[in-house]
Amino acid sequence: VTSTMACTITAKKLCIDVAKDCSYIFHLACLGVRHSIHSPFENHRVNAEGTLNVLEAAKQNNIEHFFYISTSEIYGRTTSFPITEEAATAPLTVYGASKLVGEHYTNAYNECYQLNTTVLRIFNNYGPRAHYEGDAGEIIPRSIVRILNNEKPIIFGDGLITRDFFFVKDTAHALAGLIGNPNINYKTFNIGTGVEYTMKDLLLKVLELMDKQELGLEYLADRPADVPRLWVKADKFYNATNFKANYSFENGLKETIQYYIDLSSKKDLIKDIKINNWEK
């Protein structure tokens, strides 16, 4: 990376200008699932219409390949496990729906304009620099910050919903390795580890790694539209790329914990934590 530029993907002309002289676009920009509960229209505008702007920028600048980063949330309450790319899509939130719209727009630009595209459904990403603050706060960093302040990590519901976690550095390596791969055009891939963890087991492991088991867990009411189970089958991706993850779940958690320990020495993180149900 030789330069960076901040812009909003809702500004079409700016997207087109920023994409000049680029060879590849990895489109990760979006607003998250929690945001979609209280601001559905804005969430749609950024995630769906914004994606259309980035696709148009790719087309007008003759980008070599456009990579659309989707989400496991598009699968909703699927009953087909482990989840393959062929599983039915039935998102529960505007976030999931808007990301699925982005997939369709991406495929349409491949079909109509011969733009080389790939859709990547990445399961739950985690690691250093993940959002811990406000309604964007994710369970792993938010819980680490609470534990650092001797507060119990919070579980919404009974703690039995599951997720398939993928460490951010493995994600970065997986994405970078796609450049120049001849086997991925106009294809959709799941990316994950193929191992599911309950929220309860996840937080007990974080407590153990931080040597704070005595804190225990705090249980709050279920959140609306929480997908109950996400467990991926990503063989299609691994076979097409020969990718191998470098991080075990425990090692990824250790690196993540250390990042927030270091960050907490520079700023008061707990004041930015916001705990509420998605309805509010």
Predicted features and spans:
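N-terminal Rossmann-like NAD(P)+-binding domain of SDR-like oxidoreductases, especially those catalyzing
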Residues: 1-125, 247, 255, 259-263, ...
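Short, conserved catalytic or interaction motifs in soluble domains
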Residues: 33, 128, 193
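Short glycine-/acidic-enriched loop or helix-start segments at secondary-structure transitions
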Residues: 36-37, 77-79, 129, 165, ...
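Hydrophobic alpha-helix immediately C-terminal to the catalytic Tyr-X-X-X-Lys motif of short-chain
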Residues: 101, 105, 109, 139, ...
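Conserved catalytic loops of nucleotide-sugar-dependent glycosyltransferases that act on lipid-linked
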Residues: 132-139
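C-terminal substrate-binding subdomain of Rossmann-fold SDR/epimerase-dehydratase oxidoreductases
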Residues: 148-280
